[in-house]
């Protein structure tokens, strides 16, 4: 991905007017403004910032859309949070034993935004409610005067002057808001239920992902093959979330936002046991939230006047 990509767009108030998106690598904030119409215009100024951490196995792709509306008495910013969170699923021998193999896997993916700026307030976000569907598609729309609304799907943006959409896949997982107030929002994308060869299993089932090869020396063989694992366990998760904030005009020139991507990891132990007749089998034992908040947090500084984005820190 290109770093520090900057896109500047002026949006007419005409419904769903097409956007021009010139890509300017390493450019500065746009210096000129084009007014369209008779003073009832909305200007959308776009910035994009990419940050990757090999340590945490996370890439953040954050789109910052500044909404400059002459009929709205506040600054507004739409943050679209995309990227990739690796599953970091791992198989290993438990404490060097020969009869216990372990699988560490993501029970939950974490996505969050927070600010401590007293002049900034969270005014909208997507998704809002608990969502169990495999495919998630929603739209945030903006109408002149500071009116933000959400639509249930990508096709529901016909009545907006400007819109921003999210779309992601969460097979066998559910999305829900864990925390939300005027300064922050935190989502959890959590394991739900899984179709297995022995039937439907809860995400809390102690035998979930336990395999059928008790005589193998390879830890991987104690668990089901990749073909039976959903993408969010086998590879990772591609988030697509939106938060909208307002800022008091004439107050601070800059605000800081902390954006967090990460995961909570469960550990499933597959234990080799023997029956009374000497037959071997695998018995599952589960440790829920064995590793919590394995998160990558980046602090971004937003300049409300120049519309520049700076990375101020990361863990």
From Swiss-Prot:
GO annotation, biological process: cytolysis in another organism
Keyword Cell division appears in the UniProt entry: no
The protein's role, per its UniProt record: Toxin that seems to act by forming pores in the membrane of the cell. Has a hemolytic and a leucotoxic activity.
Subunit comment: Toxicity requires sequential binding and synergistic association of a class S and a class F component which form heterooligomeric complexes. HlgC (class S) associates with HlgB (class F) thus forming an CB toxin.
Top-rank lineage group of the source organism: Bacteria
UniProt-listed NCBIfam families: hlyII
GO molecular function annotations of the record: toxin activity
Gene Ontology CC annotations of this record: extracellular region
Residues making up the signal peptide according to the UniProt record: 1-29
Key words, A-Z: Cytolysis, Hemolysis, Signal, Toxin, Virulence
Record's protein name: Gamma-hemolysin component C
Similarity annotation: Belongs to the aerolysin family.
């Amino acid at each position: 991905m290109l770093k520090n990509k900057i896109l500047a767009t002026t949006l007419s108030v005409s419904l769903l007017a097409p956007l021009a998106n010139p890509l300017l690598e390493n450019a500065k904030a746009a210096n000129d403004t084009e007014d369209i119409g008779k003073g009832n215009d909305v200007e959308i100024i776009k910035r994009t910032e990419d940050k990757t951490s090999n340590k945490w196995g996370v890439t953040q792709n954050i789109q910052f859309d500044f909404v400059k509306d002459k009929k709205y008495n506040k600054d507004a910013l739409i943050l679209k949070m995309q990227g990739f969170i690796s599953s970091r699923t791992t198989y290993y021998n438990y404490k060097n034993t020969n009869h216990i193999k372990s699988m560490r896997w993501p029970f939950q993916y974490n996505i969050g935004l927070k600010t401590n700026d007293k002049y900034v307030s969270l005014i909208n976000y997507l998704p809002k409610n608990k969502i169990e569907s495999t495919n998630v598609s929603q739209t945030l729309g903006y109408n002149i005067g500071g009116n933000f609304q959400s639509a249930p799907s990508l096709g529901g943006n016909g009545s907006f002057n400007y819109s921003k959409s999210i779309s992601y896949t969460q097979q066998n997982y559910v999305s829900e808001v864990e925390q939300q107030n005027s300064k922050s929002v935190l989502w959890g994308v959590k394991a739900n239920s899984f179709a297995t060869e022995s039937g439907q299993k809860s995400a809390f089932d102690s035998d979930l992902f336990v395999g059928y090869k008790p005589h193998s020396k390879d830890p991987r063989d104690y668990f089901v093959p990749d073909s039976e694992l959903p993408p969010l366990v086998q590879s990772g998760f591609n988030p697509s979330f939106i938060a909208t904030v307002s800022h008091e005009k004439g107050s601070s020139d800059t605000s800081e936002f902390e954006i967090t991507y990460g995961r909570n990891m469960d550990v499933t132990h597959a234990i080799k046991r023997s029956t009374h007749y000497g037959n071997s089998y695998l018995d599952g034992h589960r440790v829920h939230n064995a590793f919590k908040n394995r998160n990558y947090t980046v602090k971004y500084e937003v300049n409300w006047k120049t519309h520049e984005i700076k990375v101020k820190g990361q863990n």
